[in-house]
């Protein structure tokens, strides 16, 4: 039995297979996920698990060089955006429209669906390298 890090086998598997510039998304419970994209559904009940708990856990295991965040997240969920920025370290933030973010989900290795119910609690993480 794995004793540290992410215990969810689907998330752990996706992260371990990611290469430089591959993408992984984390979203709120309302984010529409394309049929062709792997869905890892963690949503249990309202706000469990939270977007931030999920992001923090993934960031512990995935080297991230850039993220895509919807403009609406910064504008309409500013408190959440402040928390996101704290977790990102030196990762570059690229702002795009919410529609563009939804369109980019089809290029992600997977989308992790959380129980989050904060509007625009969505992010695309682009993998970096550890060397």
Curated annotation (Swiss-Prot):
Entry protein name: D-ribose pyranase
E.C. code: 5.4.99.62
One annotated GO molecular function: D-ribose pyranase activity
Residues annotated as catalytic: 20
UniProt cross-references to InterPro entries, sorted A to Z: D-ribose_pyranase (IPR023064), RbsD-like_sf (IPR023750), RbsD_FucU (IPR007721)
Organism: Clostridium tetani (strain Massachusetts / E88)
Residues noted as binding substrate in the record, renumbered to the chain: 28, 98, 120-122
A GO-annotated cellular component: cytosol
């Amino acid at each position: 039995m794995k004793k540290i890090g992410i215990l969810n086998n689907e998330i752990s598997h996706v992260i371990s297979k990611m290469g430089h510039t591959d993408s992984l998304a984390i979203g709120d419970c309302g984010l529409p996920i394309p049929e062709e994209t792997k869905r890892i559904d963690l949503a249990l009940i309202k706000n469990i698990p939270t977007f931030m708990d999920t992001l923090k856990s993934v960031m512990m295991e995935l080297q991230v060089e850039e993220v895509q965040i919807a403009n609406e997240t910064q504008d309409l969920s500013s408190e959440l955006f402040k928390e996101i920025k704290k977790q990102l370290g030196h990762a570059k933030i690229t702002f795009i429209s919410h529609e563009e973010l939804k369109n980019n989900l089809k290029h992600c290795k997977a989308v992790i669906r959380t129980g989050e119910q904060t509007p625009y609690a969505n992010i695309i993480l682009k993998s970096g390298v550890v060397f």
